[in-house]
Amino acid sequence: MKLPEVEVVVKKYDKDEVLLELPGEDHTLCNLLRWALNRQDGIIATYRIEHPILGKEHKVDEERYVPPKMRIRAVDEDADAREALERAIEELLELVEEAKEEFSGALEEKES
């Protein structure tokens, strides 16, 4: 399965905090990622998307565009924001694969 490409601009990447910009993305990806991150102990993840008039698809002026921003913070000493991001991505990929299998199975049953 070919996944869509996602542009990611890493603003900060250390144990305590990861700051990302996700140009061209919307609440769909940001909310999923935030959900997977916040399920982990010692991690707080938030994101911000500016008003749609400043979004990529509605931009009037290239310089006014503000990409979505995600902040991942480790709030416990033993938590690592970088590792949390990697775990969240892996978890989401597994969930997508499971959903794909469920849909395929349901479609095969319907066809028989």
Swiss-Prot record:
- Spell out the subcellular localization from the entry: Cytoplasm
Q: Which domain of life is it from?
A: Archaea
Cross-referenced Gene3D superfamilies, in alphabetical order? RNA polymerase, RBP11-like subunit (3.30.1360.10)
Molecular function via GO: DNA binding; DNA-directed RNA polymerase activity; protein dimerization activity
Q: Which cysteines are joined by disulfide bonds?
A: none
Q: Which reaction does it catalyse?
A: RNA(n) + a ribonucleoside 5'-triphosphate = RNA(n+1) + diphosphate
Q: Where is the signal peptide?
A: none
Which InterPro entries has this protein been placed in? RBP11-like, RBP11-like_dimer, RNA_pol_Rpb11_13-16kDa_CS, Rpo11-like
Q: What is its EC number?
A: 2.7.7.6
Any GO CC annotation of this UniProt entry: DNA-directed RNA polymerase complex
Q: Which GO terms describe its biological process?
A: DNA-templated transcription
Stated role? DNA-dependent RNA polymerase (RNAP) catalyzes the transcription of DNA into RNA using the four ribonucleoside triphosphates as substrates.
The entry's family comment says: Belongs to the archaeal Rpo11/eukaryotic RPB11/RPC19 RNA polymerase subunit family.
Q: What interactions and quaternary structure are annotated?
A: Part of the RNA polymerase complex.
Protein name as annotated: DNA-directed RNA polymerase subunit Rpo11
Naturally occurring in which organism (per UniProt): Methanopyrus kandleri (strain AV19 / DSM 6324 / JCM 9639 / NBRC 100938)
Upper taxonomic lineage: Archaea, Methanobacteriati, Methanobacteriota, Methanomada group, Methanopyri
Query: Source gene?
Result: rpo11
